[in-house]
Amino acid sequence: MIEPSEDSFETMMEHKNPSSKQMESSEGSSNTTEATSGSGVRGEAGPASGPAQEKKEPPSGPLQEMEELPTDLLQDMEEPSSGPRKEIEDPPNDLLQDLEESCNGSHQARGDPLSGASDRMKEASVNPSGAREEQEAHTDLKESGREETPQEQNQTEHSTAELMAMVRSIISLYFRMQDLKEQQRVAEEILIKGINAGQLPAPKHFSGDRREFHEFIVLCQLTLQSYPRMFYNDRLRVGYVINHLSGLALEWAKALLQENSPLIGDFPAFLEAMSEVFEYRQALRVAEEAMFTIRQGGRSATEYIDEFQSLVPILGWPDEVLQAHLCQGLNEEIRHYLFRVPQPDSLDSLIVLILQIEEKLAERRAMLRLPPEARPRNLTWIDSPAPERWMVSSWLPSEVHPDINRAHLFLLLMVRVNPYHSVAVQALVDSGADGNFMDEKFAQEHYVELYEKPYPQPVQSVDGSLIGNEPVWLYTEPLVCIHQNHQESIEFDIVPSPNFSVVLGIRWLRVHAPEVDWIKGRCTFHSPYCLKNCFRPPPPCIALERHGMSLLPGLPHPYSDLADVFNPKEADDETSDQPSSDGSDDLSESEPSELQQAGDSDHSETFYECPSTAPWEPVGARMQERARLQEEYWDLQDMLTNRQDYIQMIPELFDQLHGAEWFTKLELRGTIVEESVNGHRTEDVWKAAFGLELEEMKSYQPFALSPDPIIPQNVIHFILKDMLGFFVLSYGQEVLIYSMSQEEHLHHVRQVLVRFRHHNVYCSLDKSQFHRQTVEFLGFVVTPKGVKLNKNVMTIITGYPTPGSKLSLRNFIEFVFPYRHFVERFSIIAEPLVRQLLSSYQFYWGVEEQEAFECLKRAFRKAPLLHHPKPQNPFYLETGVTGTALHASLIQIDDQTGKRACCAFYSRNISPIEVEYSQAEMKILPIRAAFMVWCRYLENTEEPIMILLNTEDLASLNNDRLTVLLPGHWVFFFSHFNFDVMELPEQDGGRALPPVRNLRWRRAFQRNTAARQTLLLASRGFPRDPSTESGEEENEEQDELNEQILRQELLAMIPIDQILNSFLAHFSMAQIRAVILHFFRGLLYWKNTLALAAILVLLRVRQCLSLRPAPAMRVARPQPQRSLRLILDSSLIAGSSITTAITQLLTQMPALVGANTIPAQELAELFLGPGRWQRNALHSQAHRGLQFTPGFWLTLCEFFGVRVTPQEGHLPALRQNRYLELHVVGDEDVVLREALQDDLQRYRQCGLHDGLQDTSQDKQDNDVQEAPPSHTAATHPPRPRHLMDPQVLEFLGSRLLHIHSADGQLHLLSREQAARALSQFLTLIYRRALPIPAWESQPREQARLEELPDEDEDANLD
């Protein structure tokens, strides 16, 4: 019987889709590699091949290397070799990708999809911001203060990109080393098996299964290294590997041969290209593991998205799959609101929507701390139901479904139920059924096209038994199913399965043969079938709007079915008895001017020009007009003399626009008239437009239908009453629609247009603006950040002529007074003008009035953009008293730019009662006034409000809090606010930001990870606003210090101690690349040279820390003579001189004692040659560590270029039962002297070994001395080198050499210091060790580094 199934949630939903079962994404695993043949150019990655190889690489430095290396997170450090690979279109990269330059060389030749995606990401993020800047440029006026130059901005961005590139390269290098470590582990296992069997196993044919790649490659490399004379060039080595390929891998290789690819003659590049196609790399494995377990948890959405986007480039999954995984890890609070808006059509849009919801929720939590009467009206607008919701089941994949009685294996499968959208379902894998099935109800809900079978078929299990009683009659066409980047077409049989929407049977498992992790419940696809057929980009969904035909030019496609709302001809056909023959407006030649005048007026003054026959004209219009003028005059008097603190019209008016990103402005046809007496007052117009003061209406009198109707204003408000103030603003002929996301905005615009069509209200298409991010409305420029005055208002104010009478002055004051909140210290500046207007004396215009008039116009010219206050962010309050007026400024910090953002200004004259206040009360008065005016933002804030005081006022507090000076009747009022005081920063030509701003910005920067700012810029498209408030100026030294601190904090967040023991920080990128890659490549290729043999031994030898060590194996040789022993003095460890570095080196090296008569180079063969250890008789002895001959050390001296001419009689003969000690003389010199017996006793008591064994006298007879090497052995010594040789320096750089300081800390030495210490040590050994190797007398120019032939190896080991 078929197991019950689960629900699914729809992730690619179009606007007209029905609701569907939806479910969370499940655990699963896939891959990103494709196996498609092709050719390319050779990459740089590969093992070192000598100086000639190094010369081919471009010059490298820290900066240049970072530009050359691919810097995608978790991506390989090496440039990929050319490989026949068909690139996949990756989704847009993360924010860090946008900061980097695309890789050059072979990376460009291959057309890297990551770079292309990055370019597309840049265009997507730059174009909206550029358009917004262009629109804002028309309303920007000149501002004083220092602005950042483009050079400074470019330099900052370049340094940030350089820092990000370094971080990503280090992480990429770490994961690439894990791949090499895995190959090394496989090589060790193969060597152990070969030693036990006596020979290396023959490599099996590789068919392309990625699970067998490591074993195949390592075995081929070991075999090739065992026969260097047979495979002496790269073409033969490549041919050997191709001869052991089959299936898909052979097809890939044949494609290279047919295209005559240069990879055939380059073995390292061939291996790298093969690795790109067939290797399941550690970076991909870790990224998939992280993607399956990533959850938001208690973090912010920004941090969660940062981590999510860091995994996107390396995974390369389709966009719809990434959307499903991103939604899966979100907190339930964000998901609750996310699924109430239409589904975004891309991952970038979804990220923007999530960030907006998080910000809106933070603002909501801050507003809920206010009393109910102080909360904004639109607080619950996000809770409004949406017609299309994301139907998501209530249980997560990690939880237990109530209808499932046991654990199952599920895959997150994106099923494309039709060509237009996909649905995410949890597909059951371990059902036991033989075929693939889909739930009948699920197919009906998603309108899946079904077909009838010619005859019914029973449902069978894997053993052939029948499941259920009803046969299968229906089936689907092949549907595209995507699991991460594994896509295929599956035909489903339709069965009733209420709990499981999709079931994958045994036939599916047989075809794909996935690797199943039953503990974690995941599947990974490695089979050749999947590499060949499944790992390719899925076909894109068909966008319906792309095929829509717009009936009117300029009308967006989503509204093409509503063209009759804009089409004049259709409007005439429906509303006029005499339609126009040419489809134009049925207007006379004299009417357009009147219509244009009505359209240009924000206040709809055409009401009083209407014919007297208008049915809605009020009675006694002239009397009401006179009353209106008299009331306006006295209202102006009251406003100018008012001394009370009330909530401001601005910014309260624009609270409902917080979070709005998209705007559409519709221009209504006809004439909109206002019946209200006070309808012409500016602030009343604003209240009506924003829905704050609406008339109570249950119906309206129908207006005459015509192409140019006359409609009362209250009728338009009645039509839009349930939308006004929530996502619509309307006054006169302008209707502004605003939304938080683009998908939601499409739905809101359609709602308005449908409502207008129903009420026969028509719009002008030529004057309408669709889908903008900056729009002008009622004299304001509205942006997602805030609001400012538009160009028309600024032109009227700044171009107003000098008043010549009180009437002219009153008109000027009456016009500018509603916009007073855009000017800092408005009451102080306009005080002479107001005094002149309110005086009973004859009008007089003097110098003081002229200066105030000009100063007021300059203040409006410099009026900044007022940002939307964010209650969830900290506030700064700047207040003061000047003369007879007080002023206050509400300030916050812009999250994106880190600069000062003005939210509101307030000023008023001091009342006669307040003049009698004491000096302390007068200083606190503006603070109290600001708290009263902005109480809806400042009351019960989570973080303290920072009150900025000047040095004099701050000193007057005497280190006491402000509450100490509060009068008794103000204490209760101030108890509602969380505030603190700080010194006001100095203002030298501009407004410097408070010092705490940098702390706040750094704290936010660290909390939201290093990429927060870049993420917001890339996702939201916000530009760096060049028109911030005038006079802004940054302290250059403070900015440089902050930048350095940010870099240090960013580097501190990298776990350097977990990445190669923190030594990467001391080297450049080129050195890291050369040391690590070449070093490990040398280990994997098993070069038969003595130097690399010594390095291999040093890496693999470990000290035995047990109390009773197991006996070691030793080669049996004749009894030796006396040899050298080295015992370390304790002062060598406790000292801090350069020589102490030798101790750290020797703790990783075997003891310097006599061992056996095997020559030094044969000793290397002993450790390298597989299966040759059994040729020597071994017996156990007491554990002393690994034994080496003096010849071994002499060979090491020769390799490092340390040579000393021995002098006769210079070195005394060693006496029996004596030891040699290593001592420090002065600060740099090292000498050997004979150890005294009491010294040895002291060493044994202290337990000083450090890896060098001090043996007792009774065991000295077991030592052996090295015999002269056989003259018949044809040996080739390594080429002598100098200690400053680059390869020697690389060797020293790969070893961690430290000095113990007095406090016990380790300090890393430089390579030059280590080379100097090593030179002294090897010189010492060279003088003491005898005999000289036989090959030392040979001409030095004939010695070179090369592989030993087979016959030489056999001769040395016989």
Curated annotation (Swiss-Prot):
Protein's membrane topology: Multi-pass membrane protein
Write down the superkingdom of origin: Eukaryota
Q: Which InterPro entries match?
A: DNA/RNA_pol_sf, DUF4939, Peptidase_aspartic_dom_sf, Rev_trsase/Diguanyl_cyclase, RT_RNaseH_2, RTL1-rel
Q: What Gene3D superfamilies does the record tag this protein with?
A: 3.30.70.270, Acid Proteases
Function, please? Plays an essential role in capillaries endothelial cells for the maintenance of feto-maternal interface and for development of the placenta.
Under the cellular component aspect of Gene Ontology, which terms does the record hold? membrane
Read off the CDD domains from this record: retropepsin_like, RT_LTR
In its keyword annotation, does this UniProt entry include Cytoplasm? no
Keyword entries, A-Z:
Developmental protein, Membrane, Transmembrane, Transmembrane helix
Task: State which gene encodes it.
Answer: RTL1
Q: Which cysteines are joined by disulfide bonds?
A: none
Q: Which species does the entry assign this protein to?
A: Homo sapiens
Q: What is the protein name stated in its UniProt record? A: Retrotransposon-like protein 1
* Low complexity bias locations: 19-30, 1267-1276
